[in-house]
């Protein structure tokens, strides 16, 4: 009887302890979920603010230039990638030419993207660096020279060639150092915004109107496929960078933090620590046969052979309370925990360029009003906000063009062809709502 009562009491105590363990584990899970939600909201809002400012600045520079400098709205030819003219007699021929131009342009973008991924896959870093350096040199020196010259002409500012050469030289050299080497974060961000605006202005000037809208529509679909498709080129690029634990090139990515300190491709810090531990363990010589592998896994490789070898070299260790206190007081060499405030968000410069192309083209081709420009501006920011919200929820690389470009195109055509005529009629008949 006594044995039976003892068994029942033990079973009851075990069931109670199991229930307490399950309830405590559920509480821990709930707390973790709440913390994840708080972090999602916190960093989602923070990242929105971090990217609203540079995107806004880039679009403001483009729109201000379009509204003030007539050079970028004057037709002086087309790019070699868009050989078909839109100055045709029929609408059908113009639509066909714009489709052909957009097809050629998108094909060039796809080929260049695949070439970049292949070069990165096979570690042709010098070729990629040379490619990016040549592009940066053209933007920072040649296109900046054209831009400054047209701005000085517009505002009737007399500047000699020596002064202009000094300005361009200093601007270009400092930009090359900040982008391709090291420099202050704000200066690097300013240069990335500026070269994005210059590239957008080139597209606005030399791309025909219908071709531009088609390119924007198709590039958003391509961006969706390239990032989310399992074999998409941009997804392969990001996954390769994650596998190698490398940062992508600063000339391709706008970063809200130091790009050589914070890597968006970083995973769990515990994975890095385990990877480094595995590397360390594989380098250690094995002094025992493979039959003792289970025991070596349990003690981490510090078996009796290792202890005998250590005692033979440094002698036996006698632990005393004083020595234990002294050891505990020593600073630990554990890797520092990642500061959440240092986590940055990155956006491709191509996204900056196409955002600015949409707003700038709307400003250049709209019916001379600001309503269409402001509508496209707000639409892009709303789309960017939704994209960053999805990024905070899914915690994976997402395309930044589809939502923003779709909203921008819808807002452009709706405002230019519906809202603006309606407002003109209200103003003409002096109706006030």
UniProtKB/Swiss-Prot annotation:
Record has Transport as a keyword: no
Region span, Important for cleavage of target proteins: 254-256, 343-347, 398-400
Transmembrane segments: 49-69, 99-119, 133-155, 161-182, 187-207, 215-238, 347-367, 374-394, 399-419
Molecular function terms, GO-annotated: aspartic endopeptidase activity, intramembrane cleaving
Localization per record: Endoplasmic reticulum membrane; Golgi apparatus membrane; Cytoplasmic granule; Cell membrane
PTM description: Heterogeneous proteolytic processing generates N-terminal (NTF) and C-terminal (CTF) fragments of approximately 35 and 20 kDa, respectively. During apoptosis, the C-terminal fragment (CTF) is further cleaved by a caspase.
Cellular component terms per the entry's GO annotation: axon; endoplasmic reticulum; endoplasmic reticulum membrane; gamma-secretase complex; Golgi apparatus; Golgi membrane; membrane; mitochondrion
A matching Pfam family: Presenilin
Topological category with respect to the lipid bilayer: Multi-pass membrane protein
One biological process term in Gene Ontology: amyloid precursor protein metabolic process
Region Disordered, annotated ranges: 1-31, 273-307
Domain statement: The PAL motif is required for normal active site conformation. Substrates, such as NOTCH1 and APP peptides, are bound between PSEN1 transmembrane domains and via the first lumenal loop and the cytoplasmic loop between the sixth and seventh transmembrane domains. Substrate binding causes a conformation change and formation of an intermolecular antiparallel beta-sheet between PSEN1 and its substrates.
Official protein name in the record: Presenilin-1
Source organism per UniProt: Xenopus laevis
Gene that this polypeptide is encoded by: psen1
């Amino acid at each position: 009887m006594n044995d039976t009562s003892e068994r029942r009491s033990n079973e009851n105590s075990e069931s109670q302890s199991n229930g307490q363990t399950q309830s405590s584990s559920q509480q821990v899970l709930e707390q973790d979920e709440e913390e994840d939600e708080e972090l999602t909201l916190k960093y989602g809002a923070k990242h929105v603010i971090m990217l609203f400012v540079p995107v806004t600045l880039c679009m403001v520079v483009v729109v201000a230039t379009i509204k003030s400098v007539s050079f970028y709205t004057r037709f002086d030819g087309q790019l070699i990638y868009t050989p078909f003219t839109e100055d045709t007699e029929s609408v059908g021929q113009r639509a066909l030419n714009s489709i052909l131009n957009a097809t050629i342009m998108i094909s060039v973008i796809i080929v260049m993207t695949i070439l970049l991924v292949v070069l990165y896959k096979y570690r042709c870093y010098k070729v990629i660096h040379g490619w990016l350096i040549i592009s940066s040199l053209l933007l920072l020196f040649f296109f900046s020279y054209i831009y400054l010259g047209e701005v000085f002409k517009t505002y009737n500012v007399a500047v000699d060639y020596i002064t202009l050469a000094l300005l361009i030289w200093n601007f270009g050299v400092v930009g090359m150092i900040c982008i391709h080497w090291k420099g202050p974060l704000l200066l690097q961000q300013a240069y990335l915004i500026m070269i994005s605006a210059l590239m957008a202005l080139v597209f606005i000037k030399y791309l025909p109107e219908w071709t531009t809208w088609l390119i924007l529509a198709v590039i958003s679909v391509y961006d969706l496929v390239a990032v989310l498709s399992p074999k998409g080129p941009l997804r392969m690029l990001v996954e390769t960078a994650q596998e190698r634990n490398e940062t992508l090139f600063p000339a391709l990515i706008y970063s809200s933090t130091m790009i050589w300190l914070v890597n968006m491709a970083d995973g769990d810090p515990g994975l890095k620590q385990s990877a480094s531990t595995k590397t360390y363990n594989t380098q250690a010589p094995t002094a025992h046969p493979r039959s003792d592998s289970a025991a070596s896994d349990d003690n981490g490789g510090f078996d009796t052979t290792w202890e005998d070898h250590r005692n033979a070299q440094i002698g036996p260790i006698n632990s005393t309370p004083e020595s234990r206190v002294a050891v505990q007081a020593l600073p630990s060499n554990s890797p520092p925990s990642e500061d959440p405030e240092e986590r940055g968000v990155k956006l491709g410069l191509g996204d900056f360029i196409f955002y600015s192309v949409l707003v700038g083209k709307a400003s250049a081709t709209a019916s001379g009003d600001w309503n269409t420009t402001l509508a496209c501006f707000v639409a892009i920011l709303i789309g960017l906000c939704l994209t960053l919200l999805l990024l905070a929820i899914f915690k994976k690389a997402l395309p930044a063009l589809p939502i923003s470009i779709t909203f921008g195109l819808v807002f452009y055509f709706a405002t230019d062809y519906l809202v603006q005529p309606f407002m003109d009629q209200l103003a003409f008949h002096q109706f006030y709502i």
